Amino acid sequence: MNTPEDSTLGREVAYPSGYDPSLLFPIPRAAGRQAIGLTGELPFIGRDRWHAYELSWLDAQGKPCVATATLHVPCDSPSLIESKSLKLYLNSLNATRFNSAEAVRTRIATDLSTRAGADVAVEFGLPPIDAVGEGESIDALDVSIDDYGPPNAAYLCARAQPAVEEVLTSALLKSNCPVTGQPDWASVTLHYRGAPIDREGLLRYLVSFRDHAEFHEQCVERIFNDVLTQCAPQWLVVEARYTRRGGLDINPLRSSASVPTPLSIFRDLRQ
């Protein structure tokens, strides 16, 4: 079984000179979910939406083509795709000839689906940037914080008040790569219906990820599971928009099965 330590993270590697799908490094999701306490049927649906900013190949005549792309990896795939391996794989297309852009899109979708173990959708282009976004930020709350990890779900609670539907946001989410220790920065959005979540507690909880080492996808699943357990909303959506690294950014989303108004798809200003 592949582990993060077996990947190319934190290692010097030569950039590929030709197309090589074996560069893609799948990591089983099961181990990370067991660490969160997720066993059996998942309490969420969702996807990992990747934005690729540095995509290039050669046309049939050898002339370079450039594009951007959006990749959708379903969260029920057996494996996630490690980010550095995805970067190296996409770079392996740089000197490869294709008869059409559609042939490139199909090849990427096929290779990613094979490694993830589920159908991965690929489309050219990126969602628009939204400088404002949805919801109400909790970052200006006047709170004292001295806990930066590990994530502490005890901060989360819901007030004994009538149910509301609201969207809360924070740009203060930071965690760290579990292999290299590099910081991962993100804006996070919570959309829910239920008793009002205590905002100061939510902010303290999100900041308690600051020294935590975990992959992006696992952080979002941990947030979803902790909020669901501690606050018991009727339904919940959690999405994190991580900043770009190596020409890629990732946007994991986890959602209850029945959500009447899904979140808009956009890129954060920091992306």
UniProtKB/Swiss-Prot annotation:
The UniProt family comment states: Belongs to the GTP cyclohydrolase I family. QueF type 2 subfamily.
* GO cellular component assignments: cytoplasm
Which catalytic reaction applies to this protein? 7-aminomethyl-7-carbaguanine + 2 NADP(+) = 7-cyano-7-deazaguanine + 2 NADPH + 3 H(+)
Broad EC category: oxidoreductase
Entry binding sites for substrate: I81, E82, S83, H216, E217
Q: Where does NADPH bind?
A: S83, K84, R245, G246
Q: Main role? A: Catalyzes the NADPH-dependent reduction of 7-cyano-7-deazaguanine (preQ0) to 7-aminomethyl-7-deazaguanine (preQ1).
GO molecular function annotation = preQ1 synthase activity
This protein is called what?
Answer: NADPH-dependent 7-cyano-7-deazaguanine reductase
- Taxonomic classification: Bacteria, Pseudomonadati, Pseudomonadota, Gammaproteobacteria, Lysobacterales
**Pathway linked to the protein:** tRNA modification; tRNA-queuosine biosynthesis
Could you tell me the EC number(s) of this protein? 1.7.1.13
Kindly state which keywords UniProt assigns to this record, in alphabetical order. Cytoplasm, NADP, Oxidoreductase, Queuosine biosynthesis
* A Pfam family recorded for this sequence: QueF_N
Coiled-coil regions, chain positions: none
Q: Where would one find the signal peptide in this protein? A: none
